[in-house]
Swiss-Prot record:
Role, per record: Catalyzes the dephosphorylation of undecaprenyl diphosphate (UPP). Confers resistance to bacitracin.
Keywords from the named record: Antibiotic resistance, Cell inner membrane, Cell membrane, Cell shape, Cell wall biogenesis/degradation, Hydrolase, Membrane, Peptidoglycan synthesis, Transmembrane, Transmembrane helix
Lipid bilayer topology: Multi-pass membrane protein
Family assignment from sequence similarity: Belongs to the UppP family.
Species this chain originates from: Saccharophagus degradans (strain 2-40 / ATCC 43961 / DSM 17024)
GO molecular function, one term: undecaprenyl-diphosphatase activity
Main location: membrane
Keyword Transmembrane: yes
Name of the molecule in the record: Undecaprenyl-diphosphatase
Lineage: Bacteria, Pseudomonadati, Pseudomonadota, Gammaproteobacteria, Cellvibrionales
Gene transcribed to yield this protein: uppP
Alphabetical GO biological process terms: cell wall organization; peptidoglycan biosynthetic process; regulation of cell shape; response to antibiotic
Entry-linked InterPro entries: UppP
Amino acid sequence: MDILHAVFLALIQGITEFLPISSSAHLILPKELFGWEDQGLAFDVAVHVGTLSAVILYFRKDIVNLIAGWFGSITGKQSENGSLAWCIIVATVPAGLFGLLLGNFIEEHLRSVSVIATTTVVFGLLLWFADAKHSETKQLAQMTLFIALVIGLAQALAMIPGTSRSGITITAALLLGFGRSDAARFSFLLSIPIITLSGGYMGLKLLEESNVNWQEIGVGVLVSAISAYICIHYFLSFINKIGMLPFVIYRLLLGAGLFALVWFA
């Protein structure tokens, strides 16, 4: 993989990781349209490190408060940050278990273009329904362990390619009564442990490889981190004004394009 390919793929990962449009749907397109080779495990780890760095940097103050609140809750001092930290932990469990139990099956059987096209469209329509019907009756401070578990179960569905982790968690939060901004904020905070687990798992597998292109890795980390940070900032700035409809329309067009690849291949 040359540097131009690395920049392009890292840019795709950085932008699509946090927008509700599915990163896997976009990463499969260069392979199908241009015949590009698979980016490889090392590059996957690199872009995970990049996107993780971006979300940690953006929410650094929140993370410090969440950690302090969590430690405080252990010593018996209750706080909103402590409760939210426990909610994030609980919401992470379903996806972790789902990945351990079904990760290999999904990799072997559900990474086809037809599956990604279907999930891109179906979950895009579900996002539209949730956004149209959301009532904004809850704030993030009202998050409970049960609600977090439901959102976590939704996040587990994102193991299926094309679903979009941010898309399905925002959808679930909207359906449960949260506003767009709070739904997106919780989704992004929830991404931190799940990206850490996923990147850590791939990192362990990477130890078995001997041929690693460090230039590609550097490009992957840097480009994905910068693009992801910018994406998070503008998404949170404009989501209450523009809503989810632009992303729904985009998903429908993308799904149609993927179906066209299947039908005319």
